[in-house]
């Protein structure tokens, strides 16, 4: 059977069942999702060739995934730098930021220019917006989305490429074009428009009964892998 691509309503419903029926905490799922993102990045962009990563984090759970991924990437030998233009004032996100600070992961307060990004980084991790995003992009994030639209650096997007509609995908020809898309839990409808080189599924935590209920038809993760190539 074919892999299912979720619409926005289905993606929200699956998340809510994980929280309410299966009693996962946000912390649990965020840690597993961010760890799987770090593993997918490591498979596609080894630290030997792409050591310096600009991790762009948004205000919601997608941004939290990015903070987790940054921490794990640092442990894997990368040098991540975090750009977090609108930090979330909740204990979970404050703790994730604190963990990164305690690991001496640098952050930048201003969005790099296209030129400075090309000089200072080898890869951008796009963890701005998740499946709850509805256009247009808010003012705080316009500069970083424009950076990703204009840069020649490879981009790895977490779940949804920033600025894309979760169901319709790209809204304009100049939208972000990631080289790696890491779909989490299950791919969303917008992933059908993905034309980059690498598409991975991460978030190896979906209970079999939930997979069957939504007919997700997820691929089998090989061995003890945390992500699987689609």
Curated annotation (Swiss-Prot):
Keywords: Isomerase, Metal-binding, NAD, NADP, Nucleotide-binding, Potassium. It catalyses: (6R)-NADHX = (6S)-NADHX; (6R)-NADPHX = (6S)-NADPHX. Its cofactor is K(+). Pfam families: YjeF_N (PF03853). (6S)-NADPHX binds at residues 61-65, 130-136, 159. One of its GO terms (cellular component) is mitochondrion. One of its GO terms (biological process) is metabolite repair. It is an enzyme of class 5 (isomerase). K(+) binds at residues 62, 126, 162. Its EC number is 5.1.99.6. PROSITE patterns: YJEF_N. Binds 1 potassium ion per subunit. InterPro entries: YjeF_N_dom, YjeF_N_dom_sf, YJEFN_prot_NAXE-like. One of its GO terms (molecular function) is metal ion binding. Residues 11-218 form the YjeF N-terminal domain. It comes from the Eukaryota. Signal peptide: none annotated. Catalyzes the epimerization of the S- and R-forms of NAD(P)HX, a damaged form of NAD(P)H that is a result of enzymatic or heat-dependent hydration. This is a prerequisite for the S-specific NAD(P)H-hydrate dehydratase to allow the repair of both epimers of NAD(P)HX. Belongs to the NnrE/AIBP family. PANTHER family: NAD(P)H-HYDRATE EPIMERASE (PTHR13232:SF10). This is NAD(P)H-hydrate epimerase.
